[in-house]
């Protein structure tokens, strides 16, 4: 799968290509995304009912998704971040399974890059 096909599954290629000038660089940063720990930190903090650390991890992940135009996952992470910003851990936890599925799909798409 090439980068354009990957973005057909995970986000907005036109937007990311306006920030990163070539597909090799986009691919490199997508590789770094797979090593980012913020999703795992978010999951652990939600499980531990740690609103402060969950917010921090969600906010970090939101920024990473925005910078790489990973809009499918990013939309869910924005909602989770805002619930946590308001201190609503239970609502954030309800939204998490959908985000977790999109994260899995994103990771699978990135793994299939040529």
Report each predicted region and the residues it spans.
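Two-component system phosphorelay core
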Residues: 1-56, 60-114
């Amino acid at each position: 799968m090439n980068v354009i096909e990957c973005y057909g599954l995970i986000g907005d290629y036109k937007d990311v290509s306006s920030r990163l000038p070539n597909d090799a660089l986009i691919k490199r940063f997508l590789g770094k995304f797979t090593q980012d720990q913020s999703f795992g930190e978010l999951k652990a903090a939600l499980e531990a009912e740690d609103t402060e650390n969950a917010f921090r991890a969600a906010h970090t992940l939101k920024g990473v998704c925005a910078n790489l135009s990973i809009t499918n996952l990013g939309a869910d992470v924005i909602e989770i971040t805002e619930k946590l910003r308001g201190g609503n851990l239970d609502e954030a936890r309800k939204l998490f399974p959908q985000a977790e599925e999109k994260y899995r799909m994103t990771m699978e798409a990135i793994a299939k890059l040529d």
